[in-house]
Amino acid sequence: MSKRPAPDPVSVLRGHRASVADICFHPSNSILFSGSTDGELRIWNTVQYRTVSSAWVHSAAHGIICVAASPVLGDNKVISQGRDGTVKCWDFGGGGLSRTPLLTIKTNSYHFCKLSIAKSPSEAMKIDDLEVNEIVDGMQREEQGDQPTDSIKFKGKELIEGPKYVAIAGEQASVVEIWDVNTAERIAQLPHSSGSPSNQTPNQRGMCMAVQAFLPSESQGLLSIMAGYEDGSIAWWDLRNLGVPLTSVKFHSEPVLSLCIDGSCKGGLSGAADEKILMFALDHSMGSCLIRKEIVLERPGIAGTSIRPDGKIAATAGWDHRVRIYNYRKGKPLAILKYHNATCNTVSFSADSKLLASASEDTTVALWELYLPRT
């Protein structure tokens, strides 16, 4: 049986003068945001494949490490995160950004960990629930004991109409912080510092390298955080206990570089500096994180991961310049996309699941059409 050749990109967006560190699609319009390491934020029309607007939003010395848009923020806002210790929220209207940010959060965090806007389960997610009992891969769970708990509860409706929360690696690089984008206030730290000896664990994990914030329907309004660390471990916090994670697993032998939670909030994907891509399942009743598929690569280094909103396709961005496409349900490889001639930094799917974007150190953004969803 002959294999079909991998497709070429439908378009390549050129305009950045430095490595494109991050990209994200607008939640409802044909717009793509991209941020580069020289501090430039570009807005692209993904129908006409042209720049709509560009602005220098962080200093060239520090650059952008993350751009984020979400239904939680609304249609007219986008967030940029720089290595200058700031997160800025911008108004996006009339084809361009506001001259000044609506709000600036001074996190004093100087690192490469991209922030995460809290998300709720997607209605577009049609993937069948994973049968966790059928997963045979083992995992190690930390015993929490009967410690007093501090909990923060966020209702799903509040995320749309009230406070907007982001998770970010903190001023102490091993600590995850939760911030309210509306007020620029820090509302939680993970772990919550109480001066007890048990709080030594995060430092042993090293720096927080990747983070995802989500609001699973099973959590009764409790925000969950997945954090990947320098030692290859991943911790799941559910904020009922700010001192100790719900569980901690070590699937990787090198620093975790990327995490993505799927639209059902029942599983996800991780990439690291080692040669493995891991698809995992979250059992909310047991508080466990279990491997359901381990993919071993010929060359190490996965800088970015993304899962399509419909839950069918997953993509990874590799140090080897390649974009890899997988069947997310089965974990089977589908294609290797070859366009970029330098490290691929990140990948992102559009909200309608019709486009995939990849960004690279070669200063370009490639747009791909793959396995289009049924309409």
Swiss-Prot record:
Pfam family, one: WD40
Disruption phenotype: Reduced plasmodesmata (PD)-mediated horizontal and vertical cell-to-cell transport in leaves.
Keywords on record: Cell cycle, Cytoplasm, Developmental protein, DNA damage, Nucleus, Repeat, WD repeat
Keyword Lyase among record annotations: no
Repeat positions for WD: 15-54, 59-100, 144-189, 203-247, 251-290, 297-338, 339-375
GO cellular component terms given for this protein: cytoplasm; nucleus
GO biological process: DNA damage response; plant ovule development; plasmodesma organization; plasmodesmata-mediated intercellular transport; pollen development; regulation of cell cycle; regulation of DNA repair; response to aluminum ion
Cystines in this chain: none
Cellular localisation: Cytoplasm; Nucleus
Main location: cytoplasm
Family affiliation: Belongs to the plant DSE1 protein family.
Physiological role: Involved in the formation of X-, Y-shaped and twinned plasmodesmata (PD), thus modelating PD size exclusion limit and regulating cell-to-cell transport. Cell cycle checkpoint regulator that monitors and responds to DNA damage such as DNA cross-links, and triggers the halt of the cell cycle progression in the presence of DNA cross-linking agents. Mediates the active process of aluminum- (Al) dependent root growth inhibition and thus is required for response to Al toxicity. Essential for signal transduction and development of both male and female organs.
Descriptive protein name: Protein DECREASED SIZE EXCLUSION LIMIT 1
Protein source organism: Nicotiana benthamiana
